[in-house]
């Protein structure tokens, strides 16, 4: 979601808000760089103001929902005692919204609010599109991080990232080193996005193909097997597991096994990010 686009369009329409409701997280891209050839809709660049504008739109949309639904729940709670804890949770959330804050930033439990399909219960990620000077400005970054906390803040130069994406891996590594950048911004965005969504990766390796699979944090070995094929989950017996780090450190599967790093796990095993797995199953 681009801040300037929403400002230009004078707010978010119902269709746009509906699309956000279906999302699992909100990633807001905010312009920070100054460029006379790229006009900002407000005539000046102020990322703090842009973020406040979008936040206000989302908060007002949630308040509208809350003001419509809360009285109904309050009437229900007058008859059903079991509804009273939910009323308290909704009233607490409404108070946060009335302060102009998102429910996510207040750290409230989103579970009691699930039926409302609110926008600001979702986790937020902020991407600041900067120039190279801003990428080297620790004070500027600290200010932006404080502004959006507890959300994750990612700083990148989109033009730089576009050039990087066109390069061969060796040239890209040299380009990053010359710029004093340890990690491409898009790589960090992918990593933070995975973490924010509660996702992780495991790997399978065979003679014909090696591939990564996406699962949720906390998934067990049978659940991970089911991502590959439902038969793997139904007939799950064991999982042969080694971490990717150990595989690299010891130079291969046989070497990792000799070092005692290869193990068999059962149905209760909770998958870890970077596990390299061979599933044993019976159909």
Language model regions located:
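Short, compositionally biased low-complexity segments
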Residues: 30-38, 60-71, 147-150, 161-164, ...
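Conserved nucleotide-binding/hydrolysis micro-motifs of P-loop NTPases
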Residues: 3, 31-37, 44-46, 59-60, ...
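Short loop/turn elements that form and flank the Walker-type P-loop nucleotide-binding site
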Residues: 1, 20-23, 119-122
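Short, small-residue-biased leader/transition segments that mark boundaries at the very start
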Residues: 1-7
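Conserved P-loop NTPase nucleotide-binding/switch module
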Residues: 8-11, 15-58
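Short alpha-helical basic/polar micro-motif
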Residues: 14, 18, 64, 222-223, ...
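Extended, highly charged alpha-helical segments
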Residues: 48, 53-90
């Amino acid at each position: 979601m681009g801040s300037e686009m929403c400002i230009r369009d004078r707010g978010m329409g119902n269709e746009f808000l509906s699309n956000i409701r279906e999302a699992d997280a909100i990633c807001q891209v905010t312009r920070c760089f100054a460029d006379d050839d790229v006009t900002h809709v407000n005539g000046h660049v102020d990322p703090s103001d842009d973020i406040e504008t979008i936040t206000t739109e989302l908060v007002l949309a949630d308040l509208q929902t809350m003001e419509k639904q809360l009285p109904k729940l309050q009437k229900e709670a007058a008859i059903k005692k079991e509804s009273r804890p939910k009323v308290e949770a909704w009233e607490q959330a409404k108070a946060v919204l009335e302060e102009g804050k998102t429910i996510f930033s207040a750290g409230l439990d989103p579970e009691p609010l699930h039926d409302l399909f609110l926008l600001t219960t979702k986790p937020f990620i902020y991407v600041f599109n900067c120039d190279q000077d801003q990428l080297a400005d620790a004070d500027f970054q600290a200010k932006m991080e404080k502004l959006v906390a507890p959300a994750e803040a990612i700083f990148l130069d989109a033009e730089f990232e576009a050039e990087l994406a066109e390069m061969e891996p060796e040239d890209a590594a040299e380009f990053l080193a010359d710029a004093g950048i340890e990690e491409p911004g898009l790589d960090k965005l992918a990593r933070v996005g995975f973490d924010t969504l509660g996702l992780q990766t495991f790997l399978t390796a065979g003679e014909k193909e090696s591939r990564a699979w996406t699962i949720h944090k906390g998934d067990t070995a049978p659940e991970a097997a089911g991502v590959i094929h439902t038969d793997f989950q139904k007939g799950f017996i064991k999982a042969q597991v080694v971490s990717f780090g150990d595989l690299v450190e010891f130079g291969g599967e046989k070497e990792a096994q000799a070092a005692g790093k290869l193990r068999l796990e059962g149905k209760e095993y909770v998958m870890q990010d970077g596990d390299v797995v061979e599933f044993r199953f019976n159909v």
